[in-house]
């Protein structure tokens, strides 16, 4: 999994081949791993826990426990963690505090903000996208959060033999 901060994109990649691509939102405070910085950490992390199996879209998760509340997309005044949580743990000195800081990939009801930095350190996704991603990744999956562009990692699509020539 690759998270490009400048592109505000999360790409699920297997051996250089793009499996899925999602628009995201990283921290509005930039990147870093200092305690209480509200920044998105950089480097290699891994999925350490997954929370929210079978919850409906918009289900609120507080302190990693479903509350039973459902929040509508773009509900005014609501900045809840919803739908699913993928909890990250850092693998490097530069991101070793990520788990203690509760850095997640999670759903947000503030879907209008997806595509631009708006979070408090986590990686936010649309509910339908986090549900899809959650079902595709496993505990132990590596996550690279980078200042590089997605096209640096993903091979261009090869033309199909079935492509039409005009």
Language-model segment annotations:
Residues 34-36, 55-166:
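Exported/periplasmic cell-wall-interacting domains
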């Amino acid at each position: 999994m690759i998270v490009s901060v400048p592109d505000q994109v999360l790409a699920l990649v297997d051996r250089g081949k793009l499996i899925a691509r999602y628009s995201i939102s990283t921290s509005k405070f930039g990147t870093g791993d200092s305690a209480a910085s509200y920044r998105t950490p950089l480097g290699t992390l891994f999925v350490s826990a997954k929370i929210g199996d079978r919850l409906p879209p918009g289900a609120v998760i507080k302190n990693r426990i479903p509350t039973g509340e459902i929040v509508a997309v773009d509900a005014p005044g609501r900045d809840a963690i919803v739908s699913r949580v993928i909890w990250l743990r850092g693998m490097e000195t530069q991101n070793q505090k990520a788990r203690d800081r509760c850095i997640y990939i999670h759903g947000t009801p503030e879907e209008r903000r997806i595509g631009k930095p708006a979070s408090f350190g986590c990686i936010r996704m649309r509910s339908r996208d986090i549900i899809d991603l959650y079902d595709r990744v496993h505990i132990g999956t590596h996550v690279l959060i980078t200042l590089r562009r997605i096209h640096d990692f993903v091979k261009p699509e090869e033309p199909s033999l079935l492509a039409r020539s005009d």
